[in-house]
């Protein structure tokens, strides 16, 4: 892990060198996910973070954090009309996130959007199952235990899935599992309080930031899991079992400095 931490310490201080992150996330039912992901990316060192959200939640997301840039697409759900906006964002970004809180998205539109993205990406939550029909050779997938079923059903194991698709997978749990190129790594940092809502979004933001700063996908997944766990340990030491995701996010700089 020291090798990966040294990679972080070598990041240039020049503006934009620390990466621009695009986020396609959120819905009327889950308007807070874009801000959680974005704040985690910013605290991990990204220079600029831009969220692309459905029109009905634009005002909510835009008012949550003045550090977050926010664009919108028409309609209440992610549909065909949002694919072109996603492609445009990917041309601006150094890394992209798709999926957190993306309720009722059109699966075909999600798959098509992923296929238009040329930069490294993190595929999460409600974009995971539609992504299985897309090109994932530039992706890190971050399923929870409940979301990994379709992958195992289709491929038998995470190792087989990673070998066949080229994807990297981070499966969080009591012991996190990172699978890349058919190999499995483990991360044991973290506490039992890390099951609180929003820590998955925090992980996504951290990993996306590392990708945007130039790390390869395997390194970003491995270090991202470690950073989340260590940051959670610091936050839990302060707040006890009442720790929430924003407590964790605010301790990210203490972990990576």
Curated annotation (Swiss-Prot):
Q: What is its EC number?
A: 4.2.1.136
For whether the record's keyword set contains Aminoacyl-tRNA synthetase, the answer is no
Q: Is the keyword Transmembrane helix assigned to this protein?
A: no
Domain YjeF C-terminal residues, every copy: 1-257
Question: Where on this chain does (6S)-NADPHX bind?
Answer: 201
- Residues annotated for AMP binding in this entry: 200
Show the SUPFAM superfamilies listed in the entry: Ribokinase-like
Q: Which GO terms describe its biological process?
A: metabolite repair; nicotinamide nucleotide metabolic process
Top enzyme category: lyase
GO molecular function annotation: ADP-dependent NAD(P)H-hydrate dehydratase activity; ATP binding
Keywords of this entry: ATP-binding, Lyase, NAD, NADP, Nucleotide-binding
Which chemical reaction does it catalyze?
(6S)-NADHX + ADP = AMP + phosphate + NADH + H(+); (6S)-NADPHX + ADP = AMP + phosphate + NADPH + H(+)
| Pfam families to which the protein is assigned, alphabetical | Carb_kinase (PF01256)
Q: Which family does it belong to?
A: Belongs to the NnrD/CARKD family.
Assembly information from the UniProt record = Homotetramer.
What protein is this chain from? ADP-dependent (S)-NAD(P)H-hydrate dehydratase
Q: Which organism is it from?
A: Haloterrigena turkmenica (strain ATCC 51198 / DSM 5511 / JCM 9101 / NCIMB 13204 / VKM B-1734 / 4k)
Q: What is the lineage of its organism?
A: Archaea, Methanobacteriati, Methanobacteriota, Stenosarchaea group, Halobacteria
The UniProt gene name for this protein comes to: nnrD
């Amino acid at each position: 892990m020291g090798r990966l931490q040294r990679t972080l310490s070598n990041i240039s201080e020049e503006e934009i060198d620390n990466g621009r992150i695009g986020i396609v996330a959120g819905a009327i039912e889950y308007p807070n996910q874009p801000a959680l992901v974005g704040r985690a990316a910013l605290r991990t060192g990204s220079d600029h973070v831009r969220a692309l959200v459905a029109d009905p939640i634009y005002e909510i997301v835009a008012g949550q954090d003045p550090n977050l840039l926010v664009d919108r697409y028409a309609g209440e759900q992610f549909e065909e009309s949002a694919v072109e906006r996603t492609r445009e964002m990917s041309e601006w970004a150094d890394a992209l996130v798709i999926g957190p809180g993306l309720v009722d998205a059109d699966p075909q539109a999600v798959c098509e959007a992923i296929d238009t993205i040329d930069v490294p990406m993190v595929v999460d939550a409600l974009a995971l199952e539609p992504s299985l029909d897309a090109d994932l050779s530039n992706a890190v997938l971050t399923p929870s235990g409940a979301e990994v079923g379709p992958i195992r059903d289709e491929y038998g194991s995470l190792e087989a899935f990673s070998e066949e698709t080229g994807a990297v997978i981070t499966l969080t749990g009591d012991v996190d599992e990172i699978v890349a190129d058919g190999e499995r790594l483990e991360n044991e940092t973290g506490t039992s309080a890390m099951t609180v809502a929003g820590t998955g979004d925090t992980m996504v933001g951290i990993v996306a930031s590392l990708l945007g700063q130039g790390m390869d996908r395997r390194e970003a997944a491995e270090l991202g899991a470690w950073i989340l766990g260590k940051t959670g340990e610091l936050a839990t030491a302060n707040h006890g079992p009442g720790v929430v995701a924003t407590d964790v996010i605010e301790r990210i700089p203490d972990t990576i400095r």
